[in-house]
């Protein structure tokens, strides 16, 4: 597939040691020859072999405005599958912008967001799931999230899906031969073999789907509401998890009146923390609005850390909070473990996934909470090198495929082989959409709209 030659800055904006301007397309070498002058006059850009580098000056007309390195990649052995030249100049926005402008003046076109990776996909260098993994790596905050994305980039998901497609395709070929050519001596599939194959595929797809939520937490983080009565220790907990004094802590009840936000990395999970106003009855209109927002954050959160004062007996507000947490991903933290305990944790235990005695003023509580969060969200069970689904597009396609296979299983037990064949076709279509083999232009556009310019 022939494209124009494109140019864009591939590195993050701002000051830095180097910036990289990437050229890709059939005229990459011609454009590079107009903006890069090798330090060794005997060397010519047009003659550069793939996987080689040259030192020289970046020029605009006859004026040299910087010096750096040009890296050369010959098609198809490049990221995009096209001729690629990467020009490494000094960092900072002024020089990099001028270099891009020089490339455009020399015949290149400005790259659109995600155009390099889109070309890699269209040229068969990456599957659609691998292309999505590129964006996941760029966006990753934690080591495990980056490892999950890297596994997909290296083809773990593509291989897993290919194995299921192969099993279904072999099954479908046998079904088609038996249905379409009844006069031929094609052995009929036994129901047990048919069900075994379908059941195996369904289990593999279901395992992928079941691991999605934990994988999404590792990649994207989770919104976490810190809730509780006034002076239970919510802001102290926020400061403990943040590692600095993010919120004001005083003995005065109602100090926190609005939601205080802070993103933290807790183990392998990024938590978007929301420290909320203390929950109690009040006539103060401002505090009442803060409490309304507290309940709203609790209802919206993907994780709840409910803080209780362990030095006091449970109150009506404590029990109301516990009941609101029932059936939610919530951990009860009975705070002030360093003081005599008067709180009966058994009263709230039925409403929480786990109840932990802690002292939010002690650093050790951070590790205890991190381990509990990992257990509750299932991130401690994730194999970062295994196949995993990323994003709603992949989840939706995998779910449709799983449901179609389940339909084929039901059909195999009584509706006949024609019905089985229809369901298997639906499953294969969904799996091909997942990998991008038959994804619509709208789906492809949606994937690459997430990318930045230069990637």
Task: Annotate the PLM regions.
Residues 273, 307, 333:
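Generic enzyme active-site microenvironment
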Residues 1-147, 151, 155, 331:
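A glycine-rich (often HGG/GG-containing) alpha/beta subdomain
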Residues 55-65, 70-74, 254-282, 300:
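Switch I (G2) and immediately adjacent beta-strands of P-loop GTPase domains
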Residues 287-311:
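Inter-motif core of Ras-like GTPase G domains
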Residues 271, 303, 331:
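Short, Asp-centered acidic motifs that coordinate Mg2+ and/or phosphate
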